[in-house]
Amino acid sequence: MATLRKVVKGLVVVVAGVIFSLGARAGDDAPLSKEQIKHFLQTAEIIKSKQSSKGVTHPWRLTLSDGTLTHDASFQPVDEHKAEMKLESGKVELGFVDSYKYNIAAYRLAELVGFDDMMPVYVERKWQGKTGSLSWWLPVKMDDAERVQKKIEPPDPDKWNRQMFRIRVFDELVYDSDPNLTNVLIGEDWTVWRVDFSRAFRRNKELRAPKDLVKCDRQLLERLKALNAGELAEKTKNYLTKDEINGVMARRDKIVATFQAMIAQKGEKEVLY
């Protein structure tokens, strides 16, 4: 499987905003806020289900309804822990974890650093006796694997690249051991989302692919600098261990140091946007 860092022009993202306009509308036809989406995902009745053939964990596509709104969601109950695991790449990982908890942790971390505009809302929910992550189903036309296979170029390369840089930074922060192009979803208007972090949050304190850090969004860098271990621990309680949080903070330090060194060498205009 091609990885994110093998794509030259890369990955992608969305514009920030408090309102999550994903085709979802309230009864008065106003777009739903993220808090309204969270409430819907946690409380709406599940009326239909179908298992996906995509991905390693084969998540479920559930249809939810609260009597006014009907919308789909992705349910991922995987919570696998192994002392040793041979990955698809052929590498062997010790202390392997593949867990829905990391999806929720990634979203909560994203909220802290201003990256949640690039992800669907994730909550925890129980269904058919299993607890898992439930995320808002996104209106997409293809994933990035399909885009690469069909050799489709983005209509706005500069915007694409700027958003690519943001995803690369976040991927280094969470240390996803399985970043692949099927986890990048592209909407009709080329809005893009990064999904599925079930193999993230490794305890490594080194960066996974430091060469991927080329440029950085100014606001994202400032939010990274302000990230606090205590706040992160509180926000991800029951989802991340102390060692996993320490890994995030150590990688944060290295990300910030990397960009500060680049700014000192090249100048701010060449590094930040």
Where are these regions (language model features)?
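Bacterial N-terminal signal peptides that target proteins for export
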Residues: 1-12
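Bacterial N-terminal signal peptides
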Residues: 10-21
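Phosphate/dinucleotide-binding and metal-coordinating scaffold of catalytic cores
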Residues: 23-273
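Non-catalytic, low-structured ubiquitin/UBL-interacting segments
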Residues: 4, 21-24
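Helix-centric, low-specificity signal for extended rod-like, repetitive segments
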Residues: 2, 18, 244-245
